[in-house]
């Protein structure tokens, strides 16, 4: 199988580290502040030009379902 010139030759694998100034950590319980309800645990993070701090949240009600949200949309719960 041939590779195109824009393919990644060495995929990234293994552990990654949250930024040192992250608002939430892996496993923290959070919920959306408004709009459609979503509550669960932090399972990852992301950043883009428009969202410098965002999180992946796995639903407690529907295990395996994950949504991504900017930090401003989430609040910590106990």
Swiss-Prot record:
Give the UniProt record's GO annotations in the biological process aspect: one-carbon metabolic process; response to antibiotic; response to methotrexate; response to xenobiotic stimulus; tetrahydrofolate biosynthetic process
Keywords from UniProt, A to Z, are: Antibiotic resistance, Methotrexate resistance, NADP, One-carbon metabolism, Oxidoreductase, Plasmid, Trimethoprim resistance
Q: Which reaction does it catalyse?
A: (6S)-5,6,7,8-tetrahydrofolate + NADP(+) = 7,8-dihydrofolate + NADPH + H(+)
According to the UniProt entry, its GO molecular function terms are:
dihydrofolate reductase activity
| Pathway where it operates | Cofactor biosynthesis; tetrahydrofolate biosynthesis; 5,6,7,8-tetrahydrofolate from 7,8-dihydrofolate: step 1/1
Q: Which additional comment does the entry carry?
A: Type II plasmid-specified enzyme is practically insensitive to trimethoprim and methotrexate.
> Is NADP there in the keyword field?
yes
Its ancestry begins with: Bacteria, Pseudomonadati, Pseudomonadota, Gammaproteobacteria, Enterobacterales
Domain comment from the record reads as follows: The active site is situated at the inner surface of a pore formed by the four subunits.
What EC number(s) does its UniProt record assign?
Answer: 1.5.1.3
Summarizing the function annotation, the protein's role is: Key enzyme in folate metabolism. Catalyzes an essential reaction for de novo glycine and purine synthesis, and for DNA precursor synthesis.
Q: What is this protein identified as? A: Dihydrofolate reductase type 2
